[in-house]
Amino acid sequence: MNTLFMHCRPGFESEVCSEIAEHAARLEVAGYAKARPNTACAEFICSEPDGAERLMSGQRFDQLIFPRQWTRGVFLDLPETDRISVILGQMADFPVCGSLWLEVVDTNDGKELSNFCKKFEAPLRKALSQAGKLIDDPRKPRLLLTFKSGREVFLGLADAGNSAMWPMGIPRLKFPREAPSRSTLKLEEAWHHFIPRDQWDERLSGDMTGVDLGAAPGGWTYQLVRRGMLVTAIDNGPMAESLMDTGLVQHLMADGFTYKPRQPVDWMVCDIVEKPARNAALLETWLGEGLCREAVVNLKLPMKQRYAEVRRLLDRIEEGFKERGIRVSIGCKQLYHDREEVTCHLRRLDVAKTARPRKG
C-alpha cells in the first residue's frame, strides 16, 4: 500500500501534486507525485511500503488545501463478473475496517459510475461483513473503494478522523430557496469544514454581530441572518428585499476595502472578486486590528502557480500576525462549492466574544 490516492476539483491536479510533494519532503517520505490533467485525481507514489501511511499519519487532512479526499492503497483490476471475490482476496492483509465508502472521481465519466456503485455497495458490504473485514466502528480505519471504471478500482484505507467528512469530499448541502444567490452554499460549506458542528451554537450564535464585505445581493449575508446575527452589509449594489425585511440587516453603500466598523464585530465575511493579495490584506487588517474575532474570506486564484501563490499569501499573513504578537488560527481549503478560488478561515484566539449592539 505505497500509493496515496487523492480526489480534487478537475483542473487542479497539479496543485495537489505540488502540495502533497511539499508535505512528503517535510516528513521525509520519499516518492513522487503524478496526475493527468482534468482527471479530478492525483497520486503520490511512495518509494517505501509504509510511506503512504507515514505521510497520512504525519499530516492532518483538514490542513490540506487542494485535496478533497485521500486514501492509501493499491489499484486493482476487476473481472467483468465476481468482482467481490477479487476484492476480498486482495484484502487478506487489510485490517478490520469500521466503515465503507464507495467513491468515484468528480468527472463526467466518474458520475456515470454512481449507479453502479449504489447497486454494488449492498452485496459488497454483506460479503465484507461475512468475511470479518467490516464492522460498525468509527474508531477503526475506513475502507474506501474509488472506482475509475467497472473494471478498475483503487482499494484503500483512511483514518475516519483524518480524511474527508463526506464521500469524495463533496457535501450534500441543499440550496435554500429563500437565499438570494447560490454563493450562499460556499459559506455554509466553509462553516461545516472549519467549525466543528458541536461548536456552532457557541461560535455562530444569534447574539453575535457580523459584517459582509461586498454583500450584494446577500448570499453570504443570508447565512449570517439564518443564524440570527445582526449584519452590516457593505456594498454599493442592492440587497435582496427578503433580507432587509428581516430587520437584522443594515445596508451601507460603501467600499468593502476601506470600510471599518466603529466597534469590533464577531464575524467578517467577504466574497469580493479581486486580486488575492488584496483580499488577503483584508484578513491581516481585520484580525490584526481586532475588528473581528473570526473571518471567512475567499481568495480568487491566478491562472498559473496557484498553490505557490496561496502558500505565499498564507505565509505572509502568518508572519504578519507573529510580528504583531497575536494568536490566530489559519485555515484554507478549496471547497467543493469554490471554483477558481480557495476559502480562508481565520480566528483570533486571544479575543473575547463581543457584545450584541448593532455595529455601524
Give the predicted meaning of each segment:
Residues 1-360:
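SAM-dependent transferase fold signal centered on methyltransferase-like domains
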